């Protein structure tokens, strides 16, 4: 071979290659990799660290504070950019890389592209066992990074410099393919990072990854149109694939043309703004009454870019036994679910092709869509105005805490604020284009039901993995991806705050303002609801000390110690005042709200299959098990 070469270390070649990756969608081209998050340590600081110091190119380098936290920021960046731009994540060997594994799981569950670069042990094995290396008697080849194999869409190891080339090409094919988008992991041996090789210059030429919109076959479109025309009450489930495809206009056009209601998954919510007349909001276990009524009525469900998780299907009890399905998805695997008619294609392109075939078709919903929506808005108004009293208060989550316990919480937390009133107050006060970020606990349920996005692509929920700690760290990534001056609000419970808030400091370090709305009910409230609803007593889900006293934590003081602007708000009036002042700030803010437990919203027309104990001495658990068995009779088996 006489091709021209350039001598680089493996790490230098990696950085040079990342700078040359571009993505083109609908004739618009942009760099695919915008930067890299890293926590330097032994294993990456003298390899990838040296390469980035010497010549980062256009890559922005951010110093993370916890590997999982920074990776969640990278995931949120890709999500907010609709999978069209990414960040890479580099971590040191051993525990640093192990910290990335949970985040890789989050990316995989949500089909979000991130390039993970965990450092590995020595390829030569000369100094083995090195600091932070695991030793297995069965194999010297097993390292911490083998844990990534189960949570990566693509996994590879680089132990020779020339292996980098094929590894990167495979990784970028996976990350830029809508059907397989997800995390790619390339483990690089730490001695290999610094080894040099004469790389062919052509390997570093500008590479454009084309995101072509796949159009279904004529057979698929014709049969899908026939099934819709034969139905009386079809409903469209708007999944994340519809959002990533930018299918808003096509969804509105088809819904208006044929009077088909739209219901949403967490990933699909805000693809179409809430005030569109046929948008009934979130569906499933955390859905609105309106959406779940429409799904109950449906004789045909058109799933667009959805994975049909149990929270979308109410553990496969949401649909009638005769309901049929059409699944439109770029992933052929996803189209097979629920014995659906399979349409493999891009959501936006498919809807554009399908709409002309349905001209003249009208559903039989009539004015039911408007009636359902009006009923739901009245219920939302009720939830906005819930007020605590010390004599005979009935919370939304009934029959779990008695009045004395609720009064104890009111006294200890010095609050009478309900969670639903606080959340809707935030929705009504922030700017319409604000991005809201959340992931775990009871707040995703309140958000899917009660948060009304006025602007598309402003609802950012990680609910594929529902990973506690994503909320604040993900808010940083969303802010990095947001338009100038677009505010980002992290909606987080005290449980998730304690789990991880590392990148709060990073947001202050780099001037990326986020607003943290901290709901403190002194416990893991969501899971407490679940355990008590299934017959157990309240057991290790409340934050109580060894004397059984409710814990009182000043979370505002914690954030203030980092340098954030903080507020305390236990009333609607104080919350509005804090929100308005926070808008004027240029650095990260935190509003510490004490809210009463059991005041989050409850479900509507839903059921969740969980592993209730079949054998117990408690009658309440026996009853919960019998109720589960009864509900399973109404569930599809697959």
From Swiss-Prot:
Cofactors required: Mg(2+); thiamine diphosphate
Residues bound to thiamine diphosphate: 67
Binding-site positions, Mg(2+): 494, 521
Pathway: Polyol metabolism; myo-inositol degradation into acetyl-CoA; acetyl-CoA from myo-inositol: step 3/7
GO biological process terms held by the UniProt record: inositol catabolic process; isoleucine biosynthetic process; L-valine biosynthetic process
UniProt entry keywords in alphabetical sequence: Hydrolase, Magnesium, Metal-binding, NAD, Thiamine pyrophosphate
EC category: hydrolase
InterPro entries: DHS-like_NAD/FAD-binding_dom, Myo_inos_IolD, THcHDO_hydrolase_firmi, THDP-binding, Thiamin_PyroP_enz_cen_dom, Thiamin_PyroP_enz_TPP-bd_dom, TPP_enz, TPP_enzyme_TPP-bd
Any Pfam family the entry gives: TPP_enzyme_C
Keyword presence, Metal-binding: yes
Gene3D superfamilies associated with the record: 3.40.50.970, TPP-binding domain
Cofactor comment text: Binds 1 Mg(2+) ion per subunit. Binds 1 thiamine pyrophosphate per subunit.
GO molecular function terms listed in the Swiss-Prot or TrEMBL record: 3D-(3,5/4)-trihydroxycyclohexane-1,2-dione hydrolase activity; acetolactate synthase activity; flavin adenine dinucleotide binding; magnesium ion binding; thiamine pyrophosphate binding
Region (Thiamine pyrophosphate binding): 442-523
Catalytically driven reaction(s): 3D-3,5/4-trihydroxycyclohexane-1,2-dione + H2O = 5-deoxy-D-glucuronate + H(+)
GO cellular component: acetolactate synthase complex
EC number annotated for this UniProt entry: 3.7.1.22
Key word Ribonucleoprotein present: no
HAMAP family tied to this protein: IolD
Primary role: Involved in the cleavage of the C1-C2 bond of 3D-(3,5/4)-trihydroxycyclohexane-1,2-dione (THcHDO) to yield 5-deoxy-glucuronate (5DG).
Family assignment from sequence similarity: Belongs to the TPP enzyme family.
Name of the featured protein: 3D-(3,5/4)-trihydroxycyclohexane-1,2-dione hydrolase
């Amino acid at each position: 071979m006489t091709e021209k070469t350039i001598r680089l270390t493996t790490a230098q070649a990696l950085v040079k290659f990342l700078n040359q990756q571009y993505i083109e969608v609908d004739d618009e081209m942009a760099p695919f990799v915008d930067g890299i998050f890293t926590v330097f340590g032994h294993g990456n600081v003298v390899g990838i660290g040296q390469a980035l110091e010497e010549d980062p190119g256009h890559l922005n380098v951010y110093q993370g504070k916890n590997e999982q936290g920074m990776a969640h920021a990278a995931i949120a960046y890709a999500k907010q950019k609709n999978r069209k731009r990414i960040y890479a994540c580099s971590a040191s060997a051993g525990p640093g890389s192990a910290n990335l594994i949970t985040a890789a799981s989050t990316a995989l569950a949500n089909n979000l592209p991130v390039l993970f670069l965990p450092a590995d042990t020595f390829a030569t094995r000369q100094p083995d066992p090195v600091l932070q290396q695991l030793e297995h008697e069965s194999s010297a080849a097993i390292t911490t990074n083998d844990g990534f194999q189960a949570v990566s869409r693509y996994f590879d190891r680089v132990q020779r410099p020339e292996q980098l080339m094929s590894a990167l090409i495979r990784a970028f094919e996976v990350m830029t393919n809508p059907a397989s988008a997800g995390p790619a992991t390339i483990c690089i041996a730490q001695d290999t990072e610094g080894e040099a090789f004469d790389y062919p210059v052509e390997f570093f030429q500008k590479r454009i990854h084309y995101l072509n919109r796949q159009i279904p076959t004529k057979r698929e479109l014709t049969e899908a149109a026939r099934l819709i025309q034969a139905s009386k009450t079809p409903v469209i489930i708007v999944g994340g694939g519809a959002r990533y495809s930018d299918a808003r206009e096509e969804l509105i056009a088809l819904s208006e043309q044929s009077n088909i209601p739209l219901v949403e998954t967490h990933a699909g919510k805000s693809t179409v703004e809430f005030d569109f007349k046929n948008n009934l909001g979130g569906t499933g276990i955390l859905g609105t009454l309106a959406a779940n009524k429409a799904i109950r009525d449906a004789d045909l469900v058109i799933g667009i870019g959805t994975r049909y998780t149990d929270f979308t299907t109410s553990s496969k009890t949401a649909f009638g036994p005769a309901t049929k399905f059409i699944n439109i998805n770029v992933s052929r695997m996803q189209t097979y679910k629920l014995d659906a008619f399979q349409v493999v294609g891009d959501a936006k392109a498919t809807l554009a092709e399908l709409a002309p075939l349905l001209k003249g078709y009208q559903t039989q919903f009539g004015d039911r869509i408007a009636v359902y929506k009006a009923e739901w808005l009245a219920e939302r108004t009720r939830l906005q105005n819930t007020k605590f009293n010390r004599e005979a208060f009935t919370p939304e989550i009934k029959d779990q805490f008695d009045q004395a316990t609720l009064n104890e919480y009111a006294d200890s937390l010095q609050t009478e604020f309900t969670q639903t009133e606080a959340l809707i107050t935030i929705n009504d006060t922030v700017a319409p284009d604000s991005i809201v970020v959340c992931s775990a606990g009871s707040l995703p349920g309140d958000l899917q039901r009660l948060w009304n996005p006025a602007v598309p692509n402003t609802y950012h929920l990680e609910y594929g993995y529902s990973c506690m700690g994503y909320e604040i760290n993900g808010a940083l990534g969303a802010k990095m991806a947001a338009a100038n001056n677009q505010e980002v609000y992290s909606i987080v419970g005290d449980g998730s705050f304690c789990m991880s808030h590392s990148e709060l400091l990073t947001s202050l370090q780099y001037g990326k303002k986020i607003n943290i709305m901290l709901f403190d009910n002194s416990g893991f409230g969501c899971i407490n609801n679940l355990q008590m609803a299934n017959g157990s007593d309240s057991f290790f889900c409340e934050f109580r000390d060894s004397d059984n006293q409710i814990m009182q934590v000043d979370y505002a003081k914690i954030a203030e110690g980092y340098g954030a602007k903080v507020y305390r708000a236990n009333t609607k009036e104080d919350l509005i005042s804090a929100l308005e002042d926070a808008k004027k700030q240029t650095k990260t803010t935190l509003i510490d709200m004490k809210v009463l437990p059991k005041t989050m919203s409850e479900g509507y027309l839903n059921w969740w299959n969980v592993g209730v104990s079949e054998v117990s001495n408690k009658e309440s658990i026996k009853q919960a098990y019998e109720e589960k068995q009864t509900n399973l009779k109404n569930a599809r088996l697959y």
